């Protein structure tokens, strides 16, 4: 018997505002594909403008998954993302379509493509109970700060109010001497799928100009009102509100900064995030990069995916 054929998956990654959305939809049309969002914040309902969520009009009939699946007050983990996306990949493949993952949250996408294990097994019960007691007595921020000291990568990813996951990350460091983020990286081995991993990049100054313009457009589209709606619903200290585009405007509503300062900070944070995204993808993943400074290079990228995954597009039939 021959070996089991792995499912084919196309992945489009790149920094915020580089042009992933339009390209992915054009590719889905050409390759008989369906799109899975690889963005950890587009999962939240009513958080549309600040997450640059794809609109119904932009979808143009192409099915999209992992969008609008949680309420803003809900927590969401990498493990749940991994489980849901792998299920979507199976189902899309069974329908004879090509799964196309699109996004910018590196760890989330990595967790799907590689054999990452997320377990709550073992550990140090006494240490865990000590941390739980500390969280009760001194507050969740105190315990989260302890995590920041030993594993800043995990602390950035896990909200302080998600006490169970904060303590789990501390427990892993306490029992193994390794960061949770390092453990996940060590698990990285063979890809689970037959993957075409495409990265979009462009001239940095042009990208930063696009990011600044995008923030201005978001404000014109009603980002302030969108965030105000969440604020008025009493949504505080949630994982969702840590998203860029929300935490800055929350500072305005809590009278910490002026609106002008909030928008300026949003632009700065968005540019920094784009830089971090590019660094992550270049350091952690084997990506074939396409510079889209002069245009989106649809035909070139399409030919690459066809060759890598041995597909025929609708354009070539």
Question: Language-model segments: which ranges?
Answer:
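Phosphate/pyrophosphate-binding catalytic cores of soluble transferases and nucleic-acid-acting enzymes
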Residues: 1-317
